[in-house]
A protein has these predicted regions:
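Active-site beta3 strand of CheY-like receiver
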Residues: 45-51
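Active-site residues of response regulator receiver
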Residues: 9, 53
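Charged docking surfaces used in two-component/phosphorelay signaling
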Residues: 16-24
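Helix N-cap/capping motif at the beta->alpha junctions
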Residues: 31-40, 61
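Alpha4 helix (beta4-alpha4-beta5 surface) of REC/receiver domains from two-component response regulators
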Residues: 63, 86-107, 113, 117-120
Length: 124
């Protein structure tokens, strides 16, 4: 059975790119456009991994991440943060000192090999 990945990004082109890349490599995907939708999808789709943009309308990636790691059912789901804003890696780390760190940070534009390597490290 294919491992499941939830792609959370407000940019349609980024979502499509990630979905095609991941599905072409044997993963099952679902998408969410913001943190609100992502939390709902997590409970329905039960992903093995989440790729997460930080800057999104409605609920940000940071707020979604806080909710995810506090949810006992999904706290151990690896999260790969994909952001085009480099400084958010440091800001994110500083503002979440008491929380588990995301599995990885990947800068946009996303390098296919780097992302696939991190996904395989996280879930096989």
């Amino acid at each position: 059975m294919a491992k499941k990945i939830l792609v959370v990004d407000d940019e349609p082109d980024a979502r499509k790119y990630l979905v095609v890349l991941l599905e072409d490599n044997g993963y099952e995907t679902d998408v969410a456009v913001d943190g609100d939708e992502a939390m709902s999808k997590v409970h329905k789709f039960k992903p093995d991994l989440v790729t997460l943009d930080i800057i999104m309308p409605n609920e940000t990636g940071q707020k979604f991440y806080r909710e995810l790691v506090k949810d006992t059912e999904f706290a151990k789901v690896p999260v790969i943060i994909c952001s085009g804003v480099t400084r958010y890696k440091e800001l994110f780390a500083r503002s979440h000192k008491t929380m588990p760190k995301p599995f990885a940070f990947i800068e946009k534009p996303i390098d296919q090999e780097e992302l696939l390597k991190k996904v395989k490290e996280a879930i096989g």
